[in-house]
């Protein structure tokens, strides 16, 4: 039987929110089988639980925000991406503010924390959402066109194409692909950082966003080049970060997907719209388990290796 996973022991992190600039503490705790991943706002007078689901997403402006009972947690996608990459099914995430810490702008620190806590197999079958037919969402036309698509696939793979007219992006690549069964999430995707442009920073900060952003937790570019002293971590780091984000956004459906995801100029809003479109058509998906691990798709049977 392909089993569910949680962590063996609790682990903690402290940082600041990318957009809020607030100091925040995270405590990641093991959870029982079939719990799912649950954020808990422990800073409120009465703690509020926010289980991840596609419909728990309440805002997608610059990040994925989930909410329940009047409480919200912003910028969950990097932590969710790490959970997806490591195949974690059950986890409590206690948080002391309204935004997940940005740490270094990637998922690498979350992967390190979770792997340090250890991955534990649980005596319950791992449940997948298997996509049975293509589902697509589109927006705009011509230069404004963007789209995202899920198609049947015995495994989980992603392709993302971006479209940024910038020398640094052009020189490293406008597209990236990742197959969970062939690649290594920790090595190939997790270290890709969020990115932005100096020309946008003032506008974002005037809107109360990017207050915690800087060269230590994002790739920052002027009109011509990357400003970070350490330059880039990957070829096509920009497109790889979009894959990282997409993995986190899609994991908000609450179960791992068996599907091929492809997208052009998509973002948090379109990724969530794609999940809602999938769930709205019951003939397009089904819940499956694997009693025989040999029949399970590659990438889900073994815990992700370290770097």
From Swiss-Prot:
Any GO BP: lipid A biosynthetic process
NCBIfam families, alphabetized: lpxC (TIGR00325)
Catalytic activity: a UDP-3-O-[(3R)-3-hydroxyacyl]-N-acetyl-alpha-D-glucosamine + H2O = a UDP-3-O-[(3R)-3-hydroxyacyl]-alpha-D-glucosamine + acetate
Pathway, per record: Glycolipid biosynthesis; lipid IV(A) biosynthesis; lipid IV(A) from (3R)-3-hydroxytetradecanoyl-[acyl-carrier-protein] and UDP-N-acetyl-alpha-D-glucosamine: step 2/6
Organism (species): Acidovorax sp. (strain JS42)
Entry EC no(s): 3.5.1.108
Protein name: UDP-3-O-acyl-N-acetylglucosamine deacetylase
Record's GO cellular component terms: membrane
Cofactor names: Zn(2+)
Record carries keyword Hydrolase: yes
UniProt: Zn(2+) binding residues: 78, 241, 245
Gene3D superfamilies named among the record's database cross-references: lpxc deacetylase, domain 1 (3.30.230.20), lpxc deacetylase, domain 2 (3.30.1700.10)
One Pfam family hit: LpxC
Catalytic residues of the enzyme: 268
Keyword annotations: Hydrolase, Lipid A biosynthesis, Lipid biosynthesis, Lipid metabolism, Metal-binding, Zinc
Family per similarity comment: Belongs to the LpxC family.
Purpose: Catalyzes the hydrolysis of UDP-3-O-myristoyl-N-acetylglucosamine to form UDP-3-O-myristoylglucosamine and acetate, the committed step in lipid A biosynthesis.
One term of GO molecular function: metal ion binding
């Amino acid at each position: 039987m392909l089993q569910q996973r949680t962590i063996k022991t609790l682990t903690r992190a402290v940082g600041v929110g990318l957009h809020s600039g607030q100091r925040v503490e995270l405590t990641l705790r093991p959870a029982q089988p079939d719990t799912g991943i649950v954020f808990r706002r422990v800073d409120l007078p009465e703690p509020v639980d926010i289980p991840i689901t596609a419909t728990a997403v309440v805002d997608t402006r610059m990040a994925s925000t989930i909410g329940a009972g009047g409480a919200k947690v912003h910028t969950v996608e990097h932590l969710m991406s790490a959970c997806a990459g490591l195949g974690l099914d059950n986890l409590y995430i206690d948080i002391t503010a309204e935004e997940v810490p940005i740490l270094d702008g990637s998922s690498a620190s979350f992967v390190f924390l979770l792997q340090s806590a250890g991955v534990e197999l649980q005596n319950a079958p791992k449940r997948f959402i298997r996509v049975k037919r293509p589902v697509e969402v589109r927006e705009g036309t011509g230069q404004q066109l963007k789209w995202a698509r899920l198609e049947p696939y015995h495994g989980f793979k992603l392709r993302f194409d971006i479209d940024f007219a910038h020398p640094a992006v052009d020189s490293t690549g406008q597209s990236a692909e990742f197959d969970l069964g062939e690649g290594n999430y920790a090595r190939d995707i997790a270290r890709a950082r969020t990115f932005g442009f100096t020309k946008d920073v003032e506008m974002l900060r005037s809107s109360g966003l990017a207050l915690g952003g800087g060269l230590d937790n994002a790739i920052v570019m002027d009109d011509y080049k990357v400003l970070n002293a350490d330059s880039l971590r990957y070829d096509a780091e920009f497109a790889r970060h979009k894959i990282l984000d997409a993995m986190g956004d899609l994991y908000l459906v609450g179960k791992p997907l068996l599907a091929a995801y492809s997208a052009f100029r998509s973002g948090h809003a379109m990724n969530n719209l794609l999940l809602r479109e999938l769930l709205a058509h019951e003939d397009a998906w089904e819940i499956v388990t694997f009693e025989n691990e040999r029949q399970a798709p590659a990438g889900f049977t073994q815990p992700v290796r370290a770097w």
